[in-house]
Design a protein with these regions (language model features):
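Acidic/His-rich structured neighborhood in mature extracellular/periplasmic domains
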Residues: 85-197
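Start-of-domain marker
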Residues: 23-88, 99-101
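Flexible, glycine-rich surface segments
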Residues: 160-253
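Bacterial Sec-dependent N-terminal signal peptides
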Residues: 1-25
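A cross-kingdom marker for long, charged
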Residues: 30, 218-304
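Sec-exported extracytoplasmic/periplasmic mature domains
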Residues: 52-60, 150-154, 265, 269
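Second-shell loop/turn segments in exported
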Residues: 34-41, 127-135, 245-246
Length: 304
């Protein structure tokens, strides 16, 4: 055992020296400026490159990632207005996580931020700082980088993402004093402050337990034992009802829906009628506008 531990330390040192360890994110960034006319589009290309490099070259924490372990994520900016200095629009943030012992990847975040506004000058450097708000753009990028990491770590170990929620909270605290849109508490139940609160407030942070049970004890287990893994997923969904009962407008509920609803249809496609009905009856009161998608759970049972 001692020899093995020494060899592990030597291996770790070799990884560090050879530069095998990498930053945490592998983020694909796209900027759509189709709504903007009469402007040199070069600035959007420059911005896209700058954000890509910022997201992928920043060290967001102290975790060590191998190059092939980087978290796959995407950021889609749709710019709806630009006055030469200030851009406004929305941002779709997505992240995925691999499922153990399979080639399947599962979505963790699929969230649309509809209140994105920032100033940017072409070739302006994006400067990272943990202790100050360099710009609203970098604050937005920092916030979502930390949330991507927080949810990813939560999905692998109970409350494993706490360090990144703390970092995201620091970003929100600094940004709230700036007067910029999208940060103020109670301003909007789907803004960045609300997103953070959904995962940290005592009344709704059960969503973090759901993340771990659903992914690590559910999906990861399904590859080897489908019935056992699915049973854990079914049990974990009860957290959604608990959140709904105390905070029916919590963004945690819509974030789970947007990331997981289609996946749940597939998970239960081969379930027995009783299990399908149980899941349907739990989810439908929470997501009544999603009846068409939810009905597919029951439709499969009639076609078996």
């Amino acid at each position: 055992m001692k020899k093995r531990r020494i060899l592990a330390v030597i291996g770790m040192m070799l990884f560090v020296v050879s530069g095998v360890f990498s930053q945490e994110l592998n983020c694909n960034v796209e900027i759509n400026s189709d709504k903007i006319s009469g402007t040199d589009k070069g600035i959007f290309t420059t911005l896209q490159t700058a954000i890509t490099e910022y997201m992928n070259n920043t060290q967001w924490g102290n975790a060590q990632f191998l190059a092939n372990e980087r978290i796959e994520c995407k950021m889609f900016f749709t710019i709806s207005s630009f006055d030469g200095t200030t851009m406004a629009g929305d941002l779709q943030v997505q992240s995925t996580r691999p499922v153990y012992n399979s080639t399947y990847t599962t979505t963790l975040i699929n969230f649309k931020d509809s209140n994105v506004e920032f100033t940017y000058q072409e070739n302006e450097p994006l400067v990272f700082s943990e202790n100050s708000m360099e710009s609203n753009l970098t604050a937005i990028l920092n916030f979502y980088a930390y949330m991507i990491l927080a949810l990813d770590f939560d999905s692998f170990s109970p409350n494993g993402g706490q360090m990144y929620y703390d970092k995201a909270e620091n970003v929100v605290t600094m940004a709230q004093s700036s007067g910029e849109k999208g940060w103020k508490a109670f301003e909007d139940n789907k803004n960045r402050s609300a997103v953070l609160s959904a995962f940290t407030d005592n009344s709704t942070k059960g969503i973090r337990t759901l993340l771990y049970d659903y992914h690590r004890k559910g999906l990861d287990e399904m590859v080897l034992s489908p019935d056992k893994g699915k049973a854990v997923i079914t049990k974990s969904l009860a957290v959604l009802k608990q959140i709904y009962d105390v905070s029916p407008m919590s963004v945690a509920l819509s974030m789970f829906k947007d990331a997981k609803l289609d996946e749940l249809v597939n998970v239960y496609s081969k379930s027995n009628l009783t299990e399908k009905q149980s899941v349907y009856e739990l989810l439908y009161p929470l997501y009544p506008t999603e009846r068409e998608r939810l009905d597919k759970i029951k439709e499969e049972s009639t076609n078996k």
